[in-house]
Structures are given as C-alpha cells and as structure tokens.
Curated annotation (Swiss-Prot):
Origin: domain of life: Bacteria
Membrane-spanning intervals of the chain: none
Entry keyword Transport: no
Keywords from the named record: Ribonucleoprotein, Ribosomal protein, RNA-binding, rRNA-binding
Keyword hit for Ribosomal protein: yes
Pfam families cross-referenced by the UniProt entry: Ribosomal_L23
Name this polypeptide is given: Large ribosomal subunit protein uL23
Single GO MF annotation: rRNA binding
Protein task: One of the early assembly proteins it binds 23S rRNA. One of the proteins that surrounds the polypeptide exit tunnel on the outside of the ribosome. Forms the main docking site for trigger factor binding to the ribosome.
HAMAP family: Ribosomal_uL23_B
Gene: rplW
InterPro entries per UniProt: Nucleotide-bd_a/b_plait_sf, Ribosomal_uL23-like, Ribosomal_uL23/eL15/eS24_sf
Coiled coil feature spans: none
Organism listed in the record: Frankia alni (strain DSM 45986 / CECT 9034 / ACN14a)
Length: 98
C-alpha cells in the first residue's frame, strides 16, 4: 500500500511521444512500480484536481549499457498513460492547454 499520492506519481515523462499525446489529452508519468491503476487514478485526481477517464500502464525493462568498467544496467520503470476528461488539462507540461 502506498499511502501518499505524491509517492505514487514520481515525475512526468518529457519526450516527443508524450508531447504528441497531449493533443489527445493523454499525459504520461513515471509511477511507483508497485502502484496499480486505481491508485494512479486517485493520485492524479487528488494532485491535479482533474477527472481521469482511463489509465494504461507500461512496465519498461532497464537497458543494459556499456560503461568504462564493463556493463551496467539502467533501472526498470513503470509508466502510466492517463487520459483526462474533455476540458481538463494539466498545466505542468506546457503543452497545447498551457
């Protein structure tokens, strides 16, 4: 159980693909790996005061990367694609609604 909504939503994803989804009112976040869709929905609604229609999640495996001393590994992440109700926007992204 993750009690605080700010422990569920870790940070927004800043990428070309996430900015492209802003036109469809879909926002992308890195979330806690143990969070489920219901917890993510409630956290976004509490933090940003918006209505969430749908939450899709993606578990991304960490990439293996070469370092000076051998092979390293990036950590795995969980992403949430959050669809908002028409008319609701989140201003932190600086997208079409901002």
């Amino acid at each position: 159980m993750i009690p605080d909504p700010r422990d569920v939503i870790l940070r927004p994803v800043v990428s070309e693909k996430s900015y492209g989804l802003l036109d469809e009112n879909v926002y992308t976040f890195i979330v806690h790996p143990d969070a489920n869709k219901t917890q993510i929905k409630l956290a976004v609604q509490q933090i940003f005061s918006v209505r969430v229609l749908r939450v899709n999640t993606i578990n991304r495996q960490g990439k293996r990367k070469r370092t000076k001393h051998g092979w390293g590994h990036r950590s795995a992440t969980k992403r949430a694609l959050v669809s908002l109700a028409p008319g609701d926007t989140i201003e932190i992204f600086g997208g079409p609604g901002a």
